[in-house]
Amino acid sequence: MSSSKRRIETDVMKLLMSDHQVDLINDSMQEFHVKFLGPKDTPYENGVWRLHVELPDNYPYKSPSIGFVNKIFHPNIDIASGSICLDVINSTWSPLYDLINIVEWMIPGLLKEPNGSDPLNNEAATLQLRDKKLYEEKIKEYIDKYATKEKYQQMFGGDNDSDDSDSGGDLQEEDSDSDEDMDGTGVSSGDDSVDELSEDLSDIDVSDDDDYDEVANQ
């Protein structure tokens, strides 16, 4: 097994075994959705979004493709496509980063501190610089239209009463039912297939310098 393949399985397993709700697409570890909650103490705090993640064959040497599925109002996120303009993913990516870094640090950081000088949404960038109050009102308007818990439930299904992780930083206490199946909307740590894969990966050394050098030089 190549080091990229091992790293994909290891990083996705870490995400699956975390508190985040993950939905593999066609049982593939290279394409999946992640439920993302807006960071606390920001205008995005009450929003719930679905992230679409694709991992390239040569991950982690090439960065993943990540976008928002339901709409969000932000200077660095395209309203129509959900594409994210984030240097740490697009241009300064390092193999040292992993999926947990992206979900718990990089994207929350972008929502907390937008970069108005490199916008994908010009309206949001202009409001952020010139009218902070209207900017925050617009964010909340988009949350009400596209990203409340109820809207998320209607669009994507899932257990609306389950205790979710706080993607914006502090993780909430794990739901007592987290080991049960999520009926196709996520993968729990109690899933037999996940447990088997976890055992298979227990001996993997993701810091195998020889494997990393071999792939990096290809």
UniProtKB/Swiss-Prot annotation:
Asked if the Swiss-Prot or TrEMBL record annotates the protein with the keyword RNA-binding, the reply is no
**Major place of localization?**
cytoplasm
The identity of this protein, by name, is Ubiquitin-conjugating enzyme E2-24 kDa
Pfam families, alphabetized = UQ_con
Query: Sorted alphabetically, which PANTHER family does this protein's record hold?
Result: UBIQUITIN-CONJUGATING ENZYME E2
Give the main EC class.
Answer: transferase
Which intervals of the chain form a coiled coil?
A: none
**Catalytic function, reaction form:** S-ubiquitinyl-[E1 ubiquitin-activating enzyme]-L-cysteine + [E2 ubiquitin-conjugating enzyme]-L-cysteine = [E1 ubiquitin-activating enzyme]-L-cysteine + S-ubiquitinyl-[E2 ubiquitin-conjugating enzyme]-L-cysteine
* Single annotated GO MF: ubiquitin-protein transferase activity
**UniProt keyword list:** ATP-binding, Cytoplasm, Nucleotide-binding, Transferase, Ubl conjugation pathway
Q: Where is the active site?
A: C85 (glycyl thioester intermediate)
**Enzyme Commission number:** 2.3.2.23
State the InterPro entries in the record: UBQ-conjugat_E2_core, UBQ-conjugating_AS, UBQ-conjugating_enzyme/RWD
Provide the protein's localization: Cytoplasm
Q: Where is the composition biased (Acidic residues)?
A: 160-183, 192-218
Domain UBC core positions? 3-148
Record family assignment: Belongs to the ubiquitin-conjugating enzyme family.
In residue numbers, the region (Disordered) covers: 154-218
Which organism encodes this protein? Saccharomyces cerevisiae (strain ATCC 204508 / S288c) (Baker's yeast)
Which gene is annotated as encoding this protein in its UniProt record? Answer: UBC8
Naming one, the record's GO cellular component terms include: mitochondrion
